[in-house]
Amino acid sequence: MESKCEIRKLGFMVAMEIEAEPLIRHFSLEKSTVHGFDVYENDDICLIISEVGIINSTLATYILIHDLKCRKIINYGVAGFTNESYRHCSVFSVGRVFKRDVDFTALGCEPYRFPDKPSYIQLETDSRLPICDCYTSDEYIGPKSNVPKDVLVDMEAYCVAAVCEKYDIPCLIYKSISDITANENTQEQIDTYLKSAVDAICDYIIDKVLNKAPVCQGE
């Protein structure tokens, strides 16, 4: 079944089904399939589930823009945090995104920077939330990983922002802390924190973003 998503809807990109389920239920979104990706929609929004990883998130964002003609993209979901300065389930508006596995330092570039680009992409932000940087890679980040302190880590944010920047589409990114990467967590703890973080981010999206326009900075 192909999507019937009309032009100029608000597009949402999430990596996992568990992150999509609260919005699907709340807005009674109808399912379709576009190029193998699950898409859920109503008259106002399109939500696509990319599955985890930088390639999947790049493709899914392109589909929202190119095939589904969305006017603005919001990526939301759970992320790791590299310090204990915030608690689990804290919700952030992402201000800058970095590609964590980029390394051209041998050519004289700063860490995380491609030779012909800045080291990060600047995003518009929601001023009602704390602002945080997010570092994206396909690598699971654990206690021994070499990452900056007090940042979010995920597997899709930079790619979403890069595609939106390429096509001049406004982009907002929201993340909720599901795990503290400096800690060793059991699988039971990970599962519990994941559900709580999903509930926190989806409650904010439903109650604050969709029911009231965000107060944005940097547009």
Please give the residue ranges for each predicted region:
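N-terminal beta1-alpha1 ligand-phosphate binding loop
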Residues: 9-33
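Basic/polar N-terminal segments that are highly enriched at the extreme N-terminus
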Residues: 1-5, 219
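Glycine-rich phosphate- or other oxyanion-binding loops that anchor nucleotides, phosphorylated ligands
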Residues: 34-219
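Extreme N-terminal starter segment of soluble prokaryotic enzymes
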Residues: 4-11, 45
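Detector for methionine-enriched segments
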Residues: 1, 13-16, 155
